[in-house]
Amino acid sequence: MKEMNAELVCGILDEIMEYELAGVVRYTHSAMMVSGPYRIPIVAFLKEQAAESLTHAQQAGELIVGLDGHPSQRIAKINETHRHSIKDILEESLEHELHALSLYKKLLGKVADRSIYLEEYARGLIGQEEQHSLELKAMLKDFG
């Protein structure tokens, strides 16, 4: 196995943690703003995404500590578009998931062949983010 740069990996994990924490805020806000006939199932979906983002942030933070790093107390910047139609919310959610996917792929690039545990962690989260992206794309089909 190759040598792993723990400081670099902690930096990426910190970026992931901050982005996932921003996801908690984004999804919670979005859930509050949904209106219309599909409100109930979409609010439930968004609340589930917020809870999952919190879990992902906590996991990343625990890994940072395990690697002798120190998790930040920041969250990533959240862009407020003031567009709150269901289509807009789902499109912004898809954009969020795709960026999260890119962060986990970035992590995978730095831990592959260096740490089996971190490689499997990254692969698992990549799978989850890909699944969420596919779900959102399917939900957006009705909005043409």
Model-derived regions, located:
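Iron-associated oxidoreductase/ferritin-like identity signal
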Residues: 1-144
